[in-house]
Amino acid sequence: MKTLLYIGMSLFFIIGVVLLFVMENQRSEAVQKEMKMEMPKEEMNLRKATFAGGCFWCTEADFEKLPGVVKVISGYTGGNKENPTYTEVSSGTTGHVEAVQVYYDPSKITYEELLDYFWKHVDPTDAGGQFVDRGAQYRSVIFYHDEEQKRLAEESKEALSRSGRFQKPIVTEILKFTRFYRAEEYHQDYYKKN
């Protein structure tokens, strides 16, 4: 009787392990499939740029108008809180800014063109926010993903400073990109929904 009990328990354990493995494998395949659906094959050669220009609703809408920009995602970056919420970022205590992640086709639009567009849609002399949105979470920042983006961002900022277009100094920060947290779904394509 004990032998049958041990065999039954062993079989139950083995079946449980196999089921867990199968379920985890299916979940992993589903996640991979979802990622592929989110980024079609022809979009795998896209480049990424990250900008903070005040309220991400407006910044997202601005960049989505550009030919060569494939996708723009609103989110949070630059701070120290993992997985922040809109309420937390809005409080100004996380160090994050509202930002957009721009996926673009470099054969249709260059990073330099994105920078030029960015400068035309922010007040680069205002460290306290952008337009009616006040607070450090609304300041303008260019987040670079590699040394080439850093160089181009610094050169464009210097050119803007020399242009004489602004009386005050350019205070937009240029910071190394660390991590981007996608904003809640109701913030995505906000201008289309409202």
PLM region spans:
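Flexible coil/turn and secondary-structure edge motifs
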Residues: K2-N194
